[in-house]
Amino acid sequence: MSTPQIRSAHAPLRPGSDASRPKRTAATETGLVHVAPGLLGKTSRLRSLMFWIVGLVGFLAVILVVLHFGSLQKMAELVRSARPGWLLVALAVQSATYISAAFVWREALHRAGHPLPLRTLVPLGIAKVFTDQVLPSGGISGTMLVVRGLIGRRVPAEIAMAAMLVGMVSYDIAYLIVVLASASVLWFQHRMNVALIAGVAIFVVVTVAVPAAVLGLKQWGTRAPIAWLSRWLGVTTLLQELTDAPTRLLRSPRLLMQTVGLQLAIFVFDALTLWLAFNAIGEVPPLWVVFVSFIIASMVATIGPIPVGLGTFEATSVGMLSLLGVSVEAALAGTLLLRGLTFWLPMLPGVWLARREIQRH
């Protein structure tokens, strides 16, 4: 598929300009409108239910195994004694992650000449988190819901996909930065082992795969091995749609620096939420220990067999925290509080917001 040529490297994409007009607007918009609802079909729901059952079993297994090596009474006391003030601060910090995510979209849309207010984008971000958790698809389902929401707010389909591409690439860059930084810290602390090195290597391959497939499709179309890679990723329809997205936004160093910085802030806010959860229970490890443990746990959840990360995240988080000197009971209590703030709590508004977006458009 061909990409519209951009006449200026610095001029924003205007709705009426040739550069911003897709060559196949109707096809592009129709494809996008049908991709997101399709993710809510019966097959997807059955697959999601299977993922949830496996994830919950793994989650309970992790708790039982951890409690076998620790004290159930001590962990229960830590959770019961959690100070609400610290949890409220943690909730406020966690809310900043949604604002940062919305700013990523806002900056990309502003650069493309289709600005939207932040108050419109923040609810979309919450709906995305909920959709990604309920319909595990490596972030694709939630992203397509946001794209559909942007199109419903009169953002051209091509521009919405371009903004999504910026968000995806900036997220991958930021994720690679924090994982490699965490691995470096563990290396200097003499805590790296073969399993961690293998995990980091797999993560790098997986993280680079989707952007490589997208950019490869734009450059070489359906030639092998790009066609094979897109089929292996299981998101061929989305990748085909992405080939119509302008890449000029990705060639803006300023925009990339801004969006990568915002994505890095999200990781920092998430790790800070975990650190504040430890403050709530009264056992506070060093901030670097919390950050490294959170990032490695997120990495393992990303490359693990369960898309929602239930069980794999908790096991790795507790394991890393224990490896770095935190008691097993405190590690599990802090991790469970974090999951409550970042995983379970957003589902409450997420259900309503996601349904509203689907019914609205």
Predicted regions and their residues:
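Hydrophobic alpha-helical membrane segments of integral membrane proteins
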Residues: V134, L145-G149, M161-V169, A174-L176, ...
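Predominantly cytoplasmic-facing regulatory/coupling regions of multi-pass membrane proteins
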Residues: S2-I126, V185, H190-T302, A333, ...
